[in-house]
Amino acid sequence: MPKVALYNQNGQTVGEIELNDAVFGIEPNKHVLFEAVIMQRASMRQGTHKTKNRAEVSGGGRKPWRQKGTGRARQGSIRAPQWRGGGTVFGPVPRSYSYKLPKKVRRLAIKSALSSKVLENDIVVLDQLSLEAPKTKEMVKILNNLSVDRKALIVTDELNENVYLSARNIPGVKVVPANGINVLDVLNHDKLVITKAAVEKVEEVLA
């Protein structure tokens, strides 16, 4: 089982914590990580694209000229696709791009993401993370104490409003509860700052 240092909010080492091998100690599967990121990004797409077809474009109800005798090509509507201002053929329509990978694949992906942070020594485990009031200054101080000067994902055992409000204005820092941890967020941040209680919660679900 991988062992990592346990820190307090002042950046002091207060002990060690053993991480579950099945969650934090597997060989990261890069292909599964790729698939999980593509899935998440697909579900973030708006999908509100739309063009009008010849039935939806305004006008064009009258035949522009008679069928025969003009010497020109026959036309039925000025809103046919070949006309300027005409309808689009097979244009985009609103749709959802979201899809789901199998549950086993999704679980393997988040385990791979967490294990990659341990392998790269980019995980910081805190004994606890609590603030008496929302103070960005205090959160910056805690991150400085922990030598976290890059993009960081902070994971708490449950949604902590004071922590969330204190971190939301810090560029590159995001706070999520343990049940909201996901592959894209873990990979998109350089450091993973996680509380001991959150580690236990994640292990309980994924182990």
Swiss-Prot record:
GO molecular function: rRNA binding; structural constituent of ribosome
Source organism, top-level taxon: Bacteria
Swiss-Prot/TrEMBL keywords: Antibiotic resistance, Ribonucleoprotein, Ribosomal protein, RNA-binding, rRNA-binding
Ranges where the record places region Disordered: 44-78
Gene3D superfamilies the UniProt entry points to: 3.40.1370.10
Gene Ontology CC annotation, any one: ribonucleoprotein complex
Protein's GO biological process: response to antibiotic; translation
Note: Erythromycin, niddamycin, oleandomycin and spiramycin-resistant strains have changes in this protein as seen by gel electrophoresis; the nature of these changes has not been determined.
Subunit structure: Part of the 50S ribosomal subunit.
Family: Belongs to the universal ribosomal protein uL4 family.
HAMAP family cross-referenced by the UniProt entry: Ribosomal_uL4_B
Role description: One of the primary rRNA binding proteins, this protein initially binds near the 5'-end of the 23S rRNA. It is important during the early stages of 50S assembly. It makes multiple contacts with different domains of the 23S rRNA in the assembled 50S subunit and ribosome.
Protein name: Large ribosomal subunit protein uL4
Organism: Geobacillus stearothermophilus
Originating gene: rplD
